[in-house]
C-alpha cells in the first residue's frame, strides 16, 4: 500500500517509523521547512519527500495521514476525498494495529482535557498498566513500536483530529465541556461541535460516553449518543481535594476522572491523587513578589479557559491577556474581568479584539508590546495579598513556538524579578 504523510510533526514521524517496519511505501509532503535531522532520517530510509509545498503527488497514495492542524479546506485533501482516498490522522488510523485489544479511553473538550487525561492515567496506573497517547503523551505509532502492550490507553484527542477521522470507536469517550474555541480553524461553532461529537459517533451500547451534564452544547446533542451515557458530577467538597491541586478547574477534572474509573470498575479515592503531579502552565504557582502571588496559566488559550481560571480569585487580580485571538466573543470574559481585576495588561494581536470589550466596561487596562514589559509594570503596582495571572485567552504563535515556551518565558521573568 502507498502512504502519503502530509506534514512531518512528531506523530507522522512515528507513523513513518512504524510503516517502515511494515515494509510499506511512504511519501512525505511538508509545506514548511524540514529540519536537517528530518531530512537525514528520510534519506537514510529512502523515503521520497518534498518541502515548501504540498503537491498533487500526495494523491498517488492510497492512504493519506495528515497533520491535524492542516486546514479542513486544504485543496489537496478536498481533492483526495473527492477521489475516494482514505484520509485520517496517525492517532486514529493506527488504532486498528493494537492487536492486544487494550481498552481505549478518549478525552476531548475545550478546557481541562490534558489534566483530565493525566489524572485518569495516574489513577488507572494505581491498579493496572496504562499509557497516555495522542495530543499529549506519545503517538499511537510509538506505543506500537515500543511493544509494551498496556491494558489501557488514555488518549487526548482534538477537534482537528476528530474532524479528519473516518472511524473511531473508543470504549469510553469523555467530553469535558464545549466552549467556543479554534474558530480560526473551524468555519463555525456548529462545525467545531460536530467535530467534537465524532468522539462518540461510532460508539454502540457496549461503550460508555462520560459527559458534563451542565454543558449546554453536549446536552443539546445527547439524544444522538448510542453509547451508555454517564454524567459526571462533583460529589465531593473543594476542601477534600489534595492541596497542591486544589483549584476550581480541578473540581470538574477530578469528577470526570473519578467517573471514568467507576465505569472501568477500577478503584478510586481522593488520596490516590496525593502524588499526582499537576501539569505545568495550568494555574502554576511561580512565586511571590512584594507579597503578590504570580500564576502561569499559559495553557488558557481561549476566553472560556480564562473565565474558568478567574473563578479562583476575588477582586484583587492583575491579569495579562496575550497572543493571537481565535475569532471569539469576549463579552463573558470582559464581564468577569470587570468584577475581579484591578488592572489588565493586553499584549499582541488579541489586543485589538479585546480592547473594545474592556473599554465598554470601564476596565482599567493598558497595551504593552510584550509580556516582559507587562510583568515589569504590574510588579510595581501589585501589593501584599494581590494575585498576578498570565491568562492569555489566545494562541502563542504571534511571539512564541507554543504555549509552553510562553509560560516558561513568564516564569523566567518572575524569577528574575524575585532575584531583584
From Swiss-Prot:
Q: In which pathway does it act?
A: Cell wall biogenesis; peptidoglycan biosynthesis
Provide the top EC class. Answer: ligase
Tell me the Gene Ontology biological-process terms attached to this UniProt entry.
cell division; cell wall organization; peptidoglycan biosynthetic process; regulation of cell shape
Asked whether the UniProt record includes Nucleotide-binding among its keywords, one would answer yes
Alphabetized UniProt keyword annotations: ATP-binding, Cell cycle, Cell division, Cell shape, Cell wall biogenesis/degradation, Cytoplasm, Ligase, Nucleotide-binding, Peptidoglycan synthesis
Q: Where does ATP bind?
A: 109-115
- Keyword Cell division on this protein? yes
Source superkingdom: Bacteria
Q: Record's Gene3D superfamilies?
A: Mur ligase, C-terminal domain, Mur-like, catalytic domain, NAD(P)-binding Rossmann-like Domain
Record's InterPro entries?
Mur-like_cat_sf (IPR036565), Mur_ligase_C (IPR004101), Mur_ligase_C_dom_sf (IPR036615), Mur_ligase_cen (IPR013221), MurD (IPR005762)
Q: Which reaction does it catalyse?
A: UDP-N-acetyl-alpha-D-muramoyl-L-alanine + D-glutamate + ATP = UDP-N-acetyl-alpha-D-muramoyl-L-alanyl-D-glutamate + ADP + phosphate + H(+)
Tell me, what is one Gene Ontology molecular-function annotation carried by this entry? ATP binding
- Pfam families per the record? Mur_ligase_C, Mur_ligase_M, MurD_N
Protein location:
Cytoplasm
Q: Which residues form the signal peptide?
A: none
Task: Show the GO cellular component annotation of the record.
Answer: cytoplasm
EC assignment:
6.3.2.9
* Homology family: Belongs to the MurCDEF family.
Free-text function comment from the UniProt entry? Cell wall formation. Catalyzes the addition of glutamate to the nucleotide precursor UDP-N-acetylmuramoyl-L-alanine (UMA).
Q: Which HAMAP family match?
A: MurD
Full protein name: UDP-N-acetylmuramoylalanine--D-glutamate ligase
> Per the UniProt entry, what species is this protein from, by scientific name?
Fervidobacterium nodosum (strain ATCC 35602 / DSM 5306 / Rt17-B1)
Source organism lineage? Bacteria, Thermotogati, Thermotogota, Thermotogae, Thermotogales
